[in-house]
């Protein structure tokens, strides 16, 4: 069948009329603490009507209806050229590929809009653009109550990605509690924030699993549907006016998917604007949508009331093959260019595939043309119309400029520190890590058992081992920090939850117990077993130098991980870097050629080694350098070439490295 001729449809030109008349300011079911979660302690119960009204007023104040408009959105990405094309000049760079092509729409408070389309049609790109998180240049306009995307709009917007980015070792209650402490306004007390967590847990049906860990990977935890509800709950805690979700039912069974969509519908009925992408909804799910936007290769072919989609396509000549067809399946077939009388795939021979593709492309072009003729003019008129929210939003936006962050810097730091310690408690002092450090320390102590100054080369080797081992170990632990945290950091910073500085300092401070206690145990065991100078002062100074070296090495690892954001690449570069520091440290090679001698001045192991030797030996100390001969320790070739003098310069050099590498890591994170 050839596509119907493009004709003026008798379909009414107001397809966006909502079949559910819902006031955008209905009472918010999350605004009154009517549900109590038994998972929390009795101390967190509410205190009475005055307390309830105060909390309710703050949360109701935060729920400001948002009318979302987007007009003629166009977005393109660069097409990658085949390998070798630039080397041999056989191919020219491919033109940019259009992902979105003149997409328009409007969603009002109380409405649930579903974006439908086959894979690669641009659904995720569109919802990401509407959430203000799309990288690159987007042409067209997106407005929120007539204003562009601002920090105040960001704080009123919830965005749930397709992949649930959650900490696997935290429980459901802990996850939502930390989110509430970070995202809810500082006008609420801690007790009131915990009560908001109770209500969200109860209303999303998470009471049964509130004390279960999230899980993920090899960690057994809650189900996929429960994980998705936790992700939605994180956004619902802030009582968003606009909620956007990317395929929230992906990978879920039909019952769980229906429960998720029913939750979204009830949230929309509370006066919110809800937009979601969905891949292949059942007829039961489809009936829950107020509006649908159907995309085909980035172009809209329908935008309007979900209950009138069959009527519209029938009016332009496209009828389903059966009267009992799922509307979602029907429109997805049309988006792929497949009509009811298109030949079945198994009936098409190889030589007929080209004709089939041409027919499908013809159907798509016909649908796009019909949309532009019949649906786009009234939609454009509605998008251009001014609503009351557009007139009042400027005043609210000016007021919100002074409150960019929901909580203070110290509150963000303390909550992030507690959350980080809780999440990483399983690895901070894991049995495997303790076993490794204890094994190496005991083995080192036995190998250097009660060494004497007479065996000066052995003692100097032990000091160099201190600097190298506690350079490698913290560096390789640190390079995985930010690559592993990257998805969570991007998600939370995109939502404007906290300052990067509070996260960065909390993350580095939280690692200090793990990074400093283990080397302290190591040095304590190895120092006394190895027969180094039996002086408490010298021991403490040796320990301080090793810990200083650990902090510098950790900074190098953090910088490499933050800059590369690829653990494998960072580990490879770290191996090469530490090998250079090892060779240029001053132990293996005392006479480095002048043209490459500068390497030792960028090696933190070199400065650590010099400091360890400097505090271990004095100028008047001697050792047995031959039969009956005693020589000054400082005249020993391996020590003499270190040129030990004023050790404050070495301390200063390490301080510069300590500061420089951590600043580099911070700047790299700002560019995420």
UniProtKB/Swiss-Prot annotation:
Official protein name in the record: ABC transporter G family member 21
Pfam family, one: ABC2_membrane_7
Compositionally biased intervals (Polar residues): 1-35
Listed transmembrane segments: 429-449, 460-480, 512-532, 543-563, 576-596, 649-669
Domain of life: Eukaryota
Keyword line: ATP-binding, Membrane, Nucleotide-binding, Transmembrane, Transmembrane helix, Transport
GO cellular component, one term: membrane
Subcellular location: Membrane
InterPro entries with a match to the protein in the record: AAA+_ATPase, ABC2_TM, ABC_transporter-like_ATP-bd, ABC_transporter-like_CS, ABCG_dom, ABCG_transporters, P-loop_NTPase
Taxonomic lineage from the root: Eukaryota, Viridiplantae, Streptophyta, Embryophyta, Tracheophyta
ABC transporter domain mapped to chain residues: 68-322
Listed GO MF terms: ABC-type transporter activity; ATP binding; ATP hydrolysis activity
SUPFAM superfamilies: P-loop containing nucleoside triphosphate hydrolases
Recorded family membership: Belongs to the ABC transporter superfamily. ABCG family. Eye pigment precursor importer (TC 3.A.1.204) subfamily.
Annotated ATP binding sites: 117-124
Region called Disordered, residue ranges: 1-59
Sequence ranges assigned to domain ABC transmembrane type-2 in this UniProt record: 411-617
Organism: Arabidopsis thaliana
Gene name of this polypeptide: ABCG21
Membrane topology classification: Multi-pass membrane protein
Low complexity composition-biased segments: 50-59
